[in-house]
Curated annotation (Swiss-Prot):
This is CCA-adding enzyme. Its cofactor is Mg(2+). Mg(2+) binds at D32, D34. It comes from Bordetella bronchiseptica (strain ATCC BAA-588 / NCTC 13252 / RB50). GO terms for biological process: RNA repair; tRNA 3'-terminal CCA addition.
Length: 364
């Protein structure tokens, strides 16, 4: 059933907005669709069976499709940071007013259920020109938009950033707006940027705006870091590996992880990757191989070790098959049998187990 003949929205003015419209114009696969409703009230939506899920402003789930429908709204700055907003969602808010509050022109295009575009801010022209441009001066009211700009630059590698948009970001940082960002919002955007096709562009945007030193002051950012995270993206590494490579040259990586409140898996890989890279350079002997396996807890966490090796392979040649065979060879050693052989002399167990593992590696 198309949205044009959906009884759930019959009589309502509904439009697809944001990323789904933008990506459709770019010929990219459509993700989740977001809808805006013009001329309705929360009571209207409730009568139709829509399920309210919004916190700060009215957002509803369609009773059948579970897609999100938000009432058209305007925003007014009422405090510092990304939470300092007052919203108005009256039935008199127009579609154009709703689009005007959005961040970038490419995200401020609407489409009717019949496929007609509504583009009061010339977003289609910017999509065609491959330009990321802020909608208006209200962009400066939300510092998260600096991070989002970096993420979009990482995702759309062939898009440039309008000079006036970069200038506005710099003014925002100079005004202290970036200092109001909370870790959860920074991590949300940074992690999504790392998972984009060109993560280095996110760092470039944040650095040029002056925001990188504010939101990630511990990070050591240079050409090597940027090249490595881009190679990680090309190789399809998961987030933990990309984050570990981001932090590889950062001495204060633990402090950075705590600041961002990064997931434990990401912080673990960031901590272990330098050890792995250093050890791999000198891992010709079974003793060096075993030290790396044990220090990385590869026997208990083989999947994490495998992911770690894949991240290390971005930096230096790694024979993944050989390392997997080594881990399996060490895991095959029966520690219980060795303990029984050393019954009565517990001090012999640890060296005997190590010797057995070294012998196994010698034949792996």
């Amino acid at each position: 059933m198309s949205r044009a003949d959906d009884p759930g929205v019959a009589g309502l003015q509904v439009y697809i907005v944001g990323g789904a419209v933008r990506d459709g114009l770019l010929g990219l696969p459509a993700g989740d669709r977001d809808w805006v409703v013009v001329g309705a009230t929360p009571e209207d939506m409730a009568r139709r069976g829509f399920i309210p899920v919004g916190g700060d402003f009215p957002v509803f789930l369609h009773p059948r499709t579970k897609e999100e429908y938000a009432l058209a709204r305007t925003e007014r700055k009422s405090g510092r940071g990304y939470k300092g907003f007052t919203f108005y969602t009256g039935a008199d808010v127009t579609l154009e007013q709703d689009l005007q509050r959005r961040d970038l022109t490419v995200n401020a295009i609407a489409r009717t259920p019949q496929g007609e575009l509504v583009d009061p801010l010339d977003g289609v022209a910017d999509v065609r020109a491959r330009v990321l441009r802020h909608v208006g001066e209200a962009f400066a009211e939300d510092p998260v938009r600096i991070l989002r700009l970096g993420r979009f630059a990482a995702r759309f590698g062939d898009f440039s950033i309008a000079p006036e948009t970069m200038q506005l970001c710099r003014r925002m940082v100079e005004a202290g707006e970036a200092d109001a960002l909370v870790p959860e919002r920074v991590w949300k955007e940074v992690s999504r940027g790392l998972m984009a096709q060109a993560p280095s562009r996110m760092l470039d945007v944040l650095a040029r705006a002056g925001a990188l030193a504010r939101v990630m002051p511990e990070l050591h950012d240079d050409a090597a870091v940027r090249a490595e995270i881009d190679r990680a993206a090309a190789a399809g590494l998961p987030l933990a590996g990309r984050y570990a490579l981001l932090c590889r040259h950062t001495p204060e990586r633990d402090a950075l992880g705590r600041r961002l409140r990064a997931p434990v898996e990401c912080m673990d890989q960031a901590r272990l990757l330098p050890l792995a890279v250093d050890a791999l350079a000198a891992s010709a002997t079974p003793a060096a191989q075993l030290d790396l396996i044990e220090r990385c807890d590869a026997l208990r966490k083989p999947e994490r070790f495998d992911a770690l090796l894949q991240a290390a392979a971005i930096v230096a040649p790694v024979d993944l098959s050989a390392w997997r065979a080594r881990v399996q060879a060490v895991r095959a050693i029966d520690a219980g049998a060795i303990a029984r052989q050393c019954a009565g002399d517990p001090a012999r167990i640890k060296p005997a187990l190590r010797q057995a593992r070294l012998q196994a590696l010698g034949g792996a």
